[in-house]
A protein has these predicted regions:
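Bacterial N-terminal signal peptides that target proteins for export
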Residues: 2-13
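N-terminal signal peptide c-region/cleavage motif recognized by signal peptidases
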Residues: 22-25
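Immediate post-signal-peptide N-terminus of mature secreted/exported proteins
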Residues: 28-101, 213-216
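Extended amphipathic alpha-helical interaction segments
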Residues: 101-216
Length: 216
């Protein structure tokens, strides 16, 4: 299950290494050489940045919505409140800047960690909580599928980023942030999904659709 997400992570790490090298070369005063070796800044990635930002927003909205419902079913009020804060951040007009993406991704990561910790306990839900928990599954499926799609787009965008000169990189901070953080998101979701299958089995919740649609 983790093979594809690991391949995406390796590709992105390789791309980021090239980006870091470009920045270092420029910093020590060989910007012109870097431009010649690593390509010019003519390739406009603003469109890719907008597309990936929108994709990430939809992905995190679906994931956070599913997590909120799961935490409600598990009666974890503190985590429910954090979900609300993340959802507010995703709706903010400021979402799309590097700082806003970094902040939301960090909060989302903490939520996923908390989610993994809770479902690993395999708590048996009462009837009412079970009904509520089941309503989170469609959002979770959409969120994970969106994360996988975003990861693939991030690899493609990263390959284009690697050909830019350092000055051009300054214009796409949000895109670089998404490209760099997506592998960790996928890695987290891969492990959480495996635990979620076990939780659902313990609570006699059908996971057939999840297993059919979620392919890491």
């Amino acid at each position: 299950m983790r093979k594809k997400s690991q391949q995406i992570k390796i590709k992105i790490i390789t791309i980021l290494s090239v980006i870091l090298m470009a920045g270092y070369v420029h910093a020590i005063g060989f910007g012109d050489i870097a431009g010649g070796l690593l390509g010019g800044g003519g390739s406009d990635l603003s469109g890719s940045q907008d597309t990936l930002t929108a994709s990430l927003n939809k992905t995190l909205t679906d994931l956070t919505t599913s997590q909120k419902i799961m935490f409600q079913a598990l009666k974890k009020d503190k985590q429910v409140q954090l979900c609300d804060k993340v959802l507010e951040g995703l709706k903010s007009e400021d979402f799309g800047t590097k700082d806003s993406i970094d902040k939301v991704m960090e909060s989302s990561s903490k939520l996923t960690e908390a989610q993994a910790e809770q479902i690993a306990k395999k708590e048996i839900l009462d009837a009412e909580s079970k009904v509520l928990f089941v309503t989170s599954i469609p959002f979770y499926i959409k969120g994970v599928m969106g994360a996988i799609s975003t990861g693939k787009q991030a690899v493609e965008a990263g390959q284009s980023i690697a050909s830019l000169n350092p000055m051009a990189l300054l214009k796409i901070g949000a895109l670089i942030s998404i490209v760099s953080k997506t592998p960790d998101l996928l890695s987290q979701l891969s492990g959480t999904t495996s635990s979620l299958f076990e939780f659902m089995a313990a609570n006699d919740i059908d996971s057939t659709e999840m297993k059919q649609k979620i392919k890491f």
